[in-house]
């Protein structure tokens, strides 16, 4: 009986250690000024860092390139000229390091619409029925000294995050 309890305890601990971080998954970015959905995102971990790719956009057609971006940015995780990469499928959020559960910082986010790069911090906000009606991701981009803006993204699924194309 002690062996069974011990094994149960070990598996329970292992489950907590290897559980996905709540920021991982599919999200819909919401414009903080208009309240409209702008894009579907996949947020994921790779090599201990956090990344985010656009899966679809509500305003741009499939296959649109990031023509307003520079050819390169510091620490960008994909080789090649960024200005000729597609908006969908490119990791515009990259290099974030884990803080406590649900908090990531120290990376960058590039706005593919204008090519601007910002320091990035992502914080998971669980649904509380008051301020956060659903699970929410606070996506903060800063130029430095705490100057920046936050967007609050809604939890989604892969199908919804992938199907926003206007065409």
Predicted features along the sequence, with ranges:
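Short polar/acidic secondary-structure junctions
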Residues: 32-34, 112, 127-129, 142-145
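N-terminal helix-cap/turn-to-beta initiation motif at the start of protein domains
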Residues: 17-26
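Sec-dependent N-terminal signal peptides
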Residues: 4-13, 17
């Amino acid at each position: 009986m002690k062996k069974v309890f011990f094994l149960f305890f070990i598996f329970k601990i292992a489950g907590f250690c290897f559980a996905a971080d709540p920021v991982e998954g599919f999200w819909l970015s919401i414009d903080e000024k208009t309240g409209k959905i702008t894009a579907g995102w996949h947020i994921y971990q790779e090599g201990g860092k956090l990344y985010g790719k656009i899966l679809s956009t509500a305003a741009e057609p499939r296959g649109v390139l990031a023509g307003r971006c520079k050819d390169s940015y510091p620490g960008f995780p994909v080789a090649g000229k960024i200005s000729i990469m597609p908006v969908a499928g490119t990791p515009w959020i990259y290099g974030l390091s884990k803080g406590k559960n649900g908090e990531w910082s120290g990376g960058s986010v590039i706005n593919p619409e204008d090519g601007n790069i910002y320091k990035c911090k992502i914080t998971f906000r669980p649904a509380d029925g008051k301020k956060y009606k659903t699970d929410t991701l606070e996506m903060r981009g800063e130029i430095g000294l705490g100057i920046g803006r936050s967007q609050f993204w809604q939890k989604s699924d892969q199908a919804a995050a992938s199907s926003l194309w206007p065409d």
